[in-house]
Amino acid sequence: MIYESTRDINRKINPSEAILQGLSEEGGLFVLRDLGKNKLDLKNLVGKNYYEVAEEVLKLFVDFSEQEIKACVENAYKGKFSNEKITPLVELNDSYVLELFYGPTSAFKDVGLSLLPQLTKTALTKVNDKNDILILTATSGDTGKAALEGFKDVERTKIMVFYPNDGVSTVQKTQMQTQEGKNTKVCAIHGNFDDAQSGIKELFVDEEFKKELLTKNIKLSSANSINIGRLIPQVVYYIVSYLELVTTDKIKLGDKVNFVVPTGNFGNILAGYYAEQIGLPVNKLICASNNNNVLYDFLKTGVYDKNRDFLKTVSPSMDILISSNLERLLYYVSGCDNVYVASLMKDLKETGRFEVTKEILNRIQEKFQTGFADDLDTKQTIKKIYEKDSYLLDTHTAVAYKVLLDKLDKEHVNVILSTASPYKFTESVYTSLNEATNEDEFTLMNKLHEQTKVAIPENLKDLDKKEIRHKDVINKNEMKKYILEKLGDL
């Protein structure tokens, strides 16, 4: 089992090395050329629990023993999710909501970032690497806290998270600023998520920087979904949701299903593509964007153009103009053409845009549909669904629900991926149901609970009473200097 870079066929490594390295030296992402060669036996998975399905999925992607895989899965999830199903499926009208927010930080990122530290520890042992790992992560809100919580006090790892100072919700910011753990560091930047992500990607290809870290016996890795070890765990919940539909007689084994996915960095929806490649019967993957609809335009026209205003929306985790995981899809739909992908990424870096061939666009459109919702659509959808069904959507799931309503396919079962608790975006959710207010987000959290009776996740209760531990704010071009200065604190 060999991974290679999306941009260079000659850069090949084993799965453990891919997990530890995160990003290829020249900036490419690691992929399996023969993805889909081995399929899941879905029939034998019917009736299995989350842990058992996860073990079968991981076998197709990592070079660990069965015992190692089992230990990784159990250590990741046992006792850490407040719902025993991990990712339960809830019926809503004629569709289904896959609730992905029962982890330690109330966002879907917990699924991948609870397992990634276990994969990282196991990979370090397998490759007999004596260096420690420095996890560098950019976040638009949810990844940061989930990564910090996942890697907190994990032996031989250090983690630094960078987030846009004015680009996350108050709850998300407070979650990160109050993070505990002797190996954690959090810093805001003046800029947006794309600035943070681009800054980190540049450090991964900065040989001088990496050599300096090696003198301290430290190697770089990432907890963003550019790391294949973050992406693979997300494949599992697509399979699990499908199997639940089968066991509850909502569909027959083999029936195709639509998945509607609120999308920013393209990792969550790409996990659905991976699931389909290993045997899941998927009709369409529906990419739901907010007003930063660069993916919507690309999936319609084949032109990816980030030369546009970056908009702050009520769904901040999707406020992204450079969707990193799209590169992996381009690799597969181009017939694993590393040279072609490298040329597209070069165009994107130099001009801010690229255009795929008509043939490749057609291949993408065979599996992907798209839609977008603006802030007004989003807030109206939250209000409409709550008043009609007493179900409270967060602002990202509401984008997906609005897109589903616009494109409703009654021939197939539709599953909406619900990516976060509504309490992570309290102000926007509260003001969707009520008049605008100047009250702080934590006051509104309690008022929203009183109004809706939806339980506040334990990790968010009393968050405002915790000690603020991380207050640093830097310019976007100061990340390298900051990391080298602060490493000694970890």
Language model segments and positions:
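PLP-dependent amino-acid enzyme catalytic core
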Residues: 1-490
